[in-house]
Curated annotation (Swiss-Prot):
This is Ubiquitin-conjugating enzyme E2 D4. It catalyses: S-ubiquitinyl-[E1 ubiquitin-activating enzyme]-L-cysteine + [E2 ubiquitin-conjugating enzyme]-L-cysteine = [E1 ubiquitin-activating enzyme]-L-cysteine + S-ubiquitinyl-[E2 ubiquitin-conjugating enzyme]-L-cysteine. Keywords: ATP-binding, Nucleotide-binding, Transferase, Ubl conjugation pathway. One of its GO terms (biological process) is protein K63-linked ubiquitination. The gene is UBE2D4. Gene3D superfamilies: Ubiquitin Conjugating Enzyme (3.10.110.10). Accepts ubiquitin from the E1 complex and catalyzes its covalent attachment to other proteins. In vitro able to promote polyubiquitination using all 7 ubiquitin Lys residues, but may prefer 'Lys-11' and 'Lys-48'-linked polyubiquitination. Residues 1-147 form the UBC core domain. Its EC number is 2.3.2.23. InterPro entries: UBQ-conjugat_E2_core, UBQ-conjugating_AS, UBQ-conjugating_enzyme/RWD.
Amino acid sequence: MALKRIQKELTDLQRDPPAQCSAGPVGDDLFHWQATIMGPNDSPYQGGVFFLTIHFPTDYPFKPPKVAFTTKIYHPNINSNGSICLDILRSQWSPALTVSKVLLSICSLLCDPNPDDPLVPEIAHTYKADREKYNRLAREWTQKYAM
């Protein structure tokens, strides 16, 4: 079941990739993918290229894929290990969701962080208290790690 579903998603992704994103298997292992997200234009991540890993569980799509950033990023919902705090990757997962939709959700998280459910409270505090400083640091990290 999982393998057929993953193959279908790969075909769909290659045919109609989501804006600013790409993804595909690492070598021959269809359960392990690498994804790329271009920093959205209306964000401090503009111009950056961010790499992520996607690991599919054997019971996919009934369980969500494990998605993590391998590129360092300054963001309240993404920690230094690359873990992403995003409801659809946890409690709000549904088998109707796809890798494409997950990548688009991560893109919109880059544009609109959720400081009220942070993985990195210090960054969330900066985001809420001093948006200019947050944007400056996010831009600096993008230039340092994603360009």
